[in-house]
Amino acid sequence: MAPQSTAIFGIVRTDCAQCQSPKGKSRGSLLRERKLVTFCLHALLLLMEPKRCSWAKDPLLIEYHDTEWGVPSHEDHRLFELIVLESMQSGLSWLTILRKRQAFRAAFFGFDPAKIAKFGSKQIDNLLANPGIIRNRAKVEAAVTNAQATLKVQQIFGSLDSFLWNLVDRKPVINHWTDSNQIPAKTSLSERLAKEFKAQGFKFIGPTVAYAFMQAIGMVNDHETGCDRHKELGGD
C-alpha cells in the first residue's frame, strides 16, 4: 500500500474506532458518530476504487475501459466487429456506439463478415429502417464493403489478425501519456494503416478512425500512465 493510502487508512481506522461509543449518548453525539461512519465508508471506497483514464466516467465507458479498451485482440471476429463499430462512430461519441452495440450485433448477424458480405439493397434498406443502430447509408454500405474486404484479406494474408498486427511486428506500442488530452487524433502509424486498409478495399477508415481502432484492439496502449490498466497491459 502506498504511503498516502496508508495515511488515509490510518485516519479511517482512528475515526471508525471513535464511532464505537457506549450507550446513552446524546442525539448530537449519535449524529456525529453517523457522520464519522459515513466518512469511513467514503474513504474506504476511495481506497478501493481503481485508478482509471479520465474519460471513463459513464458506467458503460467504465466497463469498456476496464475490460476491453487497449487489450490486445487477435480474433478475426472481434477485429471485424471493431472495424464496423469504429467506422460507425465517426463524428459521434463512443458512448453512443456502446449504447447501441447489442442492436448492432443483432442487426449485423453477430458481425459475421461472411453473412454481411452478401447483403444486398433489401438488407441495407432494412438496416436503414432499424432505429437501434446508426442509420447512415454511407456507413452501412461501408460495413458491407468492409465485410467483403475482410474476406479478401483473410484469403491473402491468412487472417485479419496477420494483416493488422504485422504492422507493429505483433507487439503493442506502449505510449506514456499523463493525460488523455495529450493523445493525438492520428499518428504516422495510423496514416499507414489507413492506406493499407484503402489498398485492400476498405472504406470509411481514415487515419483518425484507424487510430481509434488501433487503441481499441490494443495495437497501442494509450491508457494514461496514472491508470491501473496502463501497467496491467504492459506499460512501465
Cite the ranges covered by each PLM segment.
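A general signal for intrinsically disordered, low-complexity N-terminal leader regions
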Residues: Q20, L45-L46
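Generic short amphipathic/hydrophobic targeting helices enriched at N-termini
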Residues: Q4-I8, E33, L44
